[in-house]
Amino acid sequence: MPHQILVTVRAPLKPGRGPETAHLLEALRKTVEHDGGPLAQLPGVHFARVFVLPGDDELDITDSLVYLSEIDAPQRPHLRALAADGELGALFAQCVGYPDGGSRRAAARWVRQHQVRVATRYVHTVGRGVDQVRDEARLRAEIETFLDDPAHLPVGGSPAEVHEAIRRFVAGRPDLAWALRPAAGPGLAFRARELLHAVAWPALLLPLAPVLLPAAVLGLLAIRRRESRDVPETERPTSAHVATITRGEDHGTVNPFTAYGQVKVGLLRRTTIVVALRGLDYAARHWYSRDNLAGVRSIHFARWVLLDGGRRVIFASDYDGSQESYMDDFIDRIAWGVNLVFSNGRGYPPTRWLIKDGARYEELYKRYLRRHQLPSVWFAACGDLSARNLDDNAVLRAGLAGELTDEEARTWLALL
C-alpha cells in the first residue's frame, strides 16, 4: 500500500488580487460542498484545503495563497493534476509568477517550485490508502447487510460458526474476496528510508550529547527568564471571525483546523521551535505512526509548516468531533506537547519552563486558537468516517484472514 505525503504549496498573491481571490474561493467552496469539485478529482486525496494566508506588515510579508493536501504516494501525478485543473488554475493565476496561458508543464513546474517543506507531520496510520479506506467501509456495509438476514446464519451457531459463515460469504463475492488477504504495508523503499531516519538521528546526536545537553539547559534557563516578560493575547475573537470559521465546521464527522501565528522574535525562540518540531516529527514518524498521537486517537493528519525564514508557522489538522472536544483532548492529554511548540508563538498563554501552564489556561488557550484560525475551502474524501471507524474497519478485515476461536470471534463480531 502507498505511504502518505503531506503536500504544501504556497505563493504570494499579486498586488490587488485579494477580492478576486476571495470570489474564486467562494465559487470553489460551493462546488466542493456540492460534489467535491476539482479537489475530489485529484489523485490519492484523503483531505485537501485552499486558503489565503494573511500578510504581515510588521514583517513586510504580503498575502499568499496556500494549498494543503494529504495524499497517497506517488506525489507527481497529484501535482500534475493540480496544475492542470482549470478552476484551481484560476486561483493560482492570482499569484506572482504563475505562467498565465502557459503549458501544463510550465504550470506543474510552477507548482513544484512553490512547494514548502513540512517541518512536522502526523499520519494516523501510515500505509492506509484512501482506496483501502473506501473498500473497507464497503466491506463493513456488505457484511452488515448479509447479517440482516437471519437465514444466512447457522441456527444457534457459535460465534466461531457465525464468523465462518461471514468468511464464506466474503469468499463467494469476487468483489469482496480481496478482504481475505491482509492489507499490505508501505513499500520497501519507504520502510528502508524510515528505518534509516530512525537510526541516523540518535546516532548523530548521541556523540554530541556532552555539548547539546548543557546548551539545552542554558537555553531553557534563558527561555524561563523571557517567559516572565511575555505578554499573552487576552482579546476574544470577534463574532464575525467565529462565524466565518464555524461556517466550515460540523458538516460531517471530520473537521478541519487551520491556524497560523508569528514566532516570538529572537534567535532563541526560532531555534527552540525548530528543535521542538524536529523532535515531534521524529516521535510522530517512529513512535506514533499507528492509531494515536500521544493518546489522542481523533486526529487523521496534522502538520506544522515553518514559513518566512522561520518567522511564522502554520498548523493544520483533520480531526473528529467538535472543536471544543478537540481542544479539550490536547489540554487533558498532551498540554506539554502543545506548549512545547505553541509557546514560541506571540500572544500564547503564559508558560513556565516551556512546557508548563500555557494550554492549562483553558479560556485563554481556546481564545488564542480561535483568533489565529483561518477559514479554508476544505475537502474530505471520507468525511463521515472517524479515525476510530477506520481502525475498526481495518480490524474487521484483518479478522477475515483465518479461522477464529469462539472468544476471538465474539470480540470480532462486537465490531459489527
Task: Describe each region flagged by the PLM.
Residues 1-46, 55-64, 70-77, 107-296, ...:
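Short S/T/G/P-rich N-terminal loop/turn motif that feeds into the first structured element of a domain
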Residues 33-36, 91-94, 283-287, 328-331, ...:
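Glycine-rich loops and low-complexity Gly/Arg-rich segments
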Residues 50, 302-306:
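Short edge beta-strands and adjacent turn/loop segments
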Residues 69-89, 317-339:
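Hydrophobic, ordered structural segments
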Residues 88-103, 336-352:
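Conserved short beta-strand edge segments in small beta-sheet-based binding/regulatory domains
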